[in-house]
Amino acid sequence: MQICETLKADGVTPFVLGDGLSWDAPHWYGALWQKFVPEDVLEGQDFNVKTVTIDDPGYVNGLNYFTDLLDKGYFNDNINSMEHNMALEVFYAGEGAMAYVEMLEFNDINKGLDGDFGFFAMPTIEDDEAKGNQEKLYGAPEGMIVNPNSENVDVAVDFVKFLTSVESQQKVVSEAGHTSCTIGAHTENTIPQLIDGMAYVQNFNGMSNWTDCGFEASIVDTMCKLGQDFAAQSITAEDYVAGLQETAKVVREQNAE
């Protein structure tokens, strides 16, 4: 917060955010929920379609933390009218100090900022109400799943092994400019920020899945739709969570045994 105040005092917007596609702001909310909601509740109870309730106080507390950042002027204006790529262009132009991005975007950001950037994970939140696992990273590796009921499962598995081999993934990094989860895919030609990022990931204490992947799909739809209303401050944190709870109730009933 002190750094944000210093930036703001110098006329620099601390955070750039564009939620025009409705998923960027929920990534912020999810990261804060991971810090505020107990791990067994978020990942154990609420990622399960049979038990999801979304009624832990940490959901509202996490959203109120975001509102506090908004009220202090730490974000750009017109969050909902900018898409993610537009927000990054604003970031590249020096009109914001920080942007919340995925590691897979590092190569693009390297081009946009001519290699002059650093990174850090979402910091620990020192608040008595922050009852989540502060040691985990919020996010997930990208991957592929083979349907066990499909035809030619063995062939599909062999193909996935080929795609995820070190040799194939080195091409993904060097030719496509993408990030790879395969150890050994990043070579001396990889940008240093990405090498440092992958080293960080290999030594983390676990990952908490994106809420737009962990929650059931209809809950995610509600999360994204109401998320824009919340970012615009046209609804309260309590209103937002109540909407999620209504959808969660339907999901539980649909999956009741």
Stretch-by-stretch model annotation:
Residues Q202-E257:
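Conserved C-terminal helix/tail region of periplasmic/extracytoplasmic solute-binding proteins
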Residues V16, A97-E102, G118-F120:
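Paired acidic/hydrophobic, glycine-rich loop segments that form the ligand-binding mouth/hinge
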Residues K72, K111-A176:
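Extracytoplasmic/periplasmic substrate-recognition and gating elements
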Residues M1-K50, G96:
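Extracytoplasmic/periplasmic solute-binding protein
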Residues H84, V101-F106, A121-P123, E142:
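Beta->alpha turn/N-cap motifs
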Residues C4-T6, N48-I79:
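Glycine-centered hinge/linker elements that transmit conformational signals in sensory
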Residues D19, F36-N61, K111-G112, T124-E135, ...:
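Short, solvent-exposed loop/beta-turn-alpha elements that line the ligand-binding surface or hinge
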Residues D77-Y92:
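Short helix-initiation/N-cap motifs at beta->coil->alpha
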